[in-house]
C-alpha cells in the first residue's frame, strides 16, 4: 500500500497553469500533487558565441529550489557561492530534454532560456520541471511567431517526464518524497508524446533490479507520460 493510497500506476493530481507570471514569454505553474514548480521561458534574439553564424538557435535551462521549498530551510546556492552537483545535473537534464523537441534551424539564431524554480518539493521536481517547461516553451515559441521573429513552428513534439521506482518490492509511478527516499530503485524517464524515449536515469538505491523490472518500470512510465501529455494538451487548448 502506498502512503497516499494511490494504486501502483496512479500519478498524483497534475495541474498546469499557463501565463502564471506577467513578464516572461512563457510561464507555467506545474503541480504534481504537493510538488510545485514555476517554469518560465525567456525568448531572446541571438545565440551563444559557439553558434554564431550557423543559422540555428539554442535552448538551455536553469534549475533551483527556494530555501523553504523543503521541510527545513536550506541556504540559497547563490549565498554559498556555487551550485551543487545535483543542481547542475538537473538543469543539464532539463536542457537536453527540451532541445530534443525543438528544430534548432527553424528557431533561427535565437535563444530560449528555461528557468525552473521549485516552490515546494515533495519528490519528482526534475520530472515536473520538464513537464511544465515544455508548456512554457510552447508559449514562448508561439509568442515569437506572433511577433514575426520566427516564421515556422520549431516545436517537433511535446515531451513530458515522470519518476518511477520500486517501493516495498512493487513497481510504482510518480513517487512522492516518502516513497522516493525509501525506494529500492529510483528512475526518471523522459519521453515524447508518442512514447519515444529521450532519457532514462535509473539507479538501484538498495537492491539491484532485473531486466524484467526495468521493462515493467518503462511500461509504467510510458502509460503515465501518455496521461501527463493529455494534461499538457488540455492546458494548451
UniProtKB/Swiss-Prot annotation:
GO terms for biological process: rRNA catabolic process; rRNA processing; tRNA processing. Pfam families: RNase_PH, RNase_PH_C. One of its GO terms (molecular function) is 3'-5'-RNA exonuclease activity. It catalyses: tRNA(n+1) + phosphate = tRNA(n) + a ribonucleoside 5'-diphosphate. Phosphate binds at residues 86, 124-126. InterPro entries: ExoRNase_PH_dom1 (IPR001247), ExoRNase_PH_dom2 (IPR015847), ExoRNase_PH_dom2_sf (IPR036345), PNPase/RNase_PH_dom_sf (IPR027408), Ribosomal_Su5_D2-typ_SF (IPR020568), RNase_PH (IPR050080), RNase_PH_bac-type (IPR002381), RNase_PH_CS (IPR018336). Keywords: Nucleotidyltransferase, RNA-binding, rRNA processing, Transferase, tRNA processing, tRNA-binding. Its EC number is 2.7.7.56. Phosphorolytic 3'-5' exoribonuclease that plays an important role in tRNA 3'-end maturation. Removes nucleotide residues following the 3'-CCA terminus of tRNAs; can also add nucleotides to the ends of RNA molecules by using nucleoside diphosphates as substrates, but this may not be physiologically important. Probably plays a role in initiation of 16S rRNA degradation (leading to ribosome degradation) during starvation. HAMAP family: RNase_PH. Homohexameric ring arranged as a trimer of dimers. NCBIfam families: RNasePH. Belongs to the RNase PH family. This is Ribonuclease PH.
